[in-house]
């Protein structure tokens, strides 16, 4: 994805992620070394005390970290988290 800015690059990949779509997540900012993802709080994503379930938090943290790395990666590379 040569010639595109960090936000466009991240969103282009992000839109292919089924889990992020299921969560209703959205990339609201991406620049060199940073990616901000927002998820609306819904009952289906909470634990018994109405906070986000840890699995949601972990998935968003892993995804945001991976995309922050992608903003620093060469245009012909992808980044995966495991």
Task: Mark where each language-model region is.
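Terminal targeting signals and extreme-terminal segments of soluble enzymes
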Residues: 1-82
């Amino acid at each position: 994805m040569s010639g595109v800015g960090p936000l466009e690059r991240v969103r282009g990949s992000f839109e292919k992620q089924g889990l992020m779509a299921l969560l209703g997540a959205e990339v609201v900012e991406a620049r060199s070394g940073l990616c901000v993802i927002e998820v609306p709080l819904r009952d289906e994503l909470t634990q018994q005390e109405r906070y986000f379930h840890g699995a949601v938090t972990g998935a968003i943290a892993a995804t945001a970290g991976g995309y922050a790395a992608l903003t620093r990666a060469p245009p012909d590379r992808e980044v995966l988290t495991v």
